[in-house]
Amino acid sequence: MDDSKHILITKILKNEVTEALGCTEVGLIGYAVSLCNISDPFSIDKLELTLNNGSFKNAYAVGVPNTGKYGILPAVVGGLLGNSKNKLLIFNDITYSQELEDFIKEKLEIKVIDGPLFCNIKIKDNSGNYFESLIKDNHLNVVIPKIEKEKIDVEITTSEKGEYKNLELIDFLDYLDEIPEKIGKLVEKTVQTNKNLIKGDFLNYGTDILSIIVNKTTSACNTRMTGENMPAMSVAKSGNMGIMATLPIISYDSSTENNSEKLIKSVLLSMLVTIYSTYNSSYLSSMCGCVSKGGMGAVIGLCYYKNGKNLKKLDSSARTFTANLPGIICDGGKVGCALKLASGCFAAYSSLFVDISYENGIVGKDFKECVENISKISKAMGDLDCDIVEIMSKKM
């Protein structure tokens, strides 16, 4: 394939496939808090947290690793106890303090705004000192304080995202023929890390292939949403999207051929499609991205595993998936996400066996048009977030 396309895809993958501990948004909050570098948390007089509505939703009711607790408050406390060098793994090795939680609870003020990813921390201590941090647009884009970028950090520009959006499915397929060694190892790490999240049964329907796919995928999601101290490999800044994009294919492989080469290529293709779907819409939205974006990745990855480089069948699977689940709302990260992933698994697997025609609803002519149509609906659902957040806020 064209060298410039190959370089672009490799750079995108290095940026968008990363390790995260706990729901990405509680990690975002914890990381932002830690950047304020408060030496004595008990000196805090006021702590103001401003989140965009999507980040608020995803942090509101999800488990926070190493705390045994759920939601925004323990994420803030965990951030005060963590090391900013850990970034989205901020809750690694913290020793949680109930005393500090009780103290911070009286100092914390939460504000929710509309718009893209935004996490702003403002702290005033009892000596009148002010501290601030700001992360916006993506989970690792630290605007305040100014920090020196590490060499391993890969900055993706707006124009590069635009170039990626202009790629065709055949470009992703061609990339699979020339996988760089580092990317191959990244995919292997992703497969193993996300497999490790499978702990027991969440939805154990039986022993057929679909039931195994559903059970393993939902088990991994439940492990993450309950705040187990186990990392997930996120795709497009979402751990659950990473789970949805990988576990159905991993489960299908283990139930059928156990073919490591096909597994790596299929999972990689799924991740490329998930990122592509995200760039066509947004990182966070009113539509469940795990189903609509990670699900589309799983569909294409499964179809590739089963049928190889067959564009006709890949387009067919994309059409069938588009006729099914897009439109499910995102009401935040929580244990219930596992049920949405179960629906996504069914839709992805069934898309291998049915061909829904272009004339149906929002179904596109091919993969690319299907993604564009789903993205258009996702963007049109934007106003729903205000109502979803209003309903959730009443529970605080």
Swiss-Prot record:
Its EC number is 4.4.1.28. Pfam families: SDH_alpha (PF03313). It catalyses: L-cysteine + H2O = hydrogen sulfide + pyruvate + NH4(+) + H(+). Its cofactor is [4Fe-4S] cluster. It comes from the Archaea. [4Fe-4S] cluster binds at C288, C330, C337. One of its GO terms (molecular function) is 4 iron, 4 sulfur cluster binding. The keyword Cytoplasm does not apply. Binds 1 [4Fe-4S] cluster per subunit. Keywords: 4Fe-4S, Iron, Iron-sulfur, Lyase, Metal-binding. The keyword Metal-binding applies. Homotrimer. Belongs to the L-cysteine desulfidase family. This is L-cysteine desulfidase. It comes from Methanococcus maripaludis (strain C6 / ATCC BAA-1332). The lineage of its organism: Archaea, Methanobacteriati, Methanobacteriota, Methanomada group, Methanococci.
